[in-house]
Amino acid sequence: MIRAEKGWALWAIAVLLLGGLSACGGNQETAQTGGKESENQKLTLVSYAVTRNAYEKIIPKFVKQWQEKTGKTVTFDQSYGGSGSQTRAVVDGLEADVVALALSSDVQKIEKAGLIEPKWEAEAPNNSIVTKSVVAFVTRKPDLKLAQWSELAEKNLKVITANPKTSGGARWNFLGLWGSVTQSGGTPAQAQAFVEKIYQNVPVLPKDAREASDVFYKQGQGDVLLNYENEVILAKQKGENQPYSVPTDYNISIDAPVAVVDSNVDKHGTREVAEAFVKFLFTPEAQKDFAESGFRPVDQTVAKEYASQYPTVKHLFTVQDLGGWEKVQTEFFDDGAIFDKITAKK
């Protein structure tokens, strides 16, 4: 019995020793695997609908540069949709590392949710504005010539524009309409009357600029599509020769920001690569891709190179001219604000 007990004891000790060695070996393998994983990172880019074409060109170039510079591989998950919808998705838990949205107020909402640190604008060149554009009029009939915003109402045209509750592009359209009155000397009351008349002739409110384009082009609705100039240029490059014009008397500067989502990059361990990607977007190489996709580049050298494809606007006003995003949001787009009052009258 004593021999048997000793035998069992020796066997148990051997098992424990082997188990301990296996455990040590397992930990070492995990550590090595973790090291390999750290060399392969993933970024989630959340952007608004009409930027897809540009980012599909830019991202592979950044991936190549990052590999050459660091020896590390980075892959991207990409999400595109209406800027307002994308903003809500990030606030509600979509773990974006980088957001590139249609307007600064959307980034500010993510900041207010505690996901982006204050003063994010100072973290990238050009106050974090990565592209610019203006509003364009796309007309169904070639003989319909439009030079000014006022003609939309004067000619009683059916207008297609997206819903500013979900689409950043639609907010720019709304502000372009409003500012065309107030920036030319009109009163807020006159601006509201003008905008009301336009929206009386808006048959449907798609959720984003891309869907608005589909309503106009594919479904054949409307006389005029209000759209980003960059979308119109891109469509022309793809062979869609729909006539369009840019109102050059007054127009709004559509300034689109980009930002790192601080809480998510810290959680994912991707801050370094996320910040590098944001900075890459301001390089001439990336800015040329934005220009090729119809955006007005913020790099001055690239802007001069592509100047011929953009009409000069005589009076280019900004959101700041309308009081800034906080005032604009409260006055126009909050629940019960001017936009809701206008659509309630339809």
Where are these regions (language model features)?
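Ligand-binding pocket segment of bilobal, Venus flytrap-like solute-binding proteins
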Residues: 184-249
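Short helix-loop capping/hinge motifs at secondary-structure junctions, enriched
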Residues: 142-148, 166, 179-187, 264-272
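Periplasmic-binding protein-like
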Residues: 129-136, 195-199, 206-207, 238-271
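Bacterial N-terminal signal peptides that target proteins for export
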Residues: 2-11
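C-terminal motif of bacterial Sec signal peptides marking the signal peptidase cleavage site
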Residues: 19-23
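N-terminal segment of the mature folded domain
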Residues: 28-166
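Short beta-strand->loop
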Residues: 46-48, 139-141, 157-184, 198-202, ...
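Extracellular/periplasmic juxtamembrane helices and adjacent flexible linkers that interface
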Residues: 2, 28, 265-346
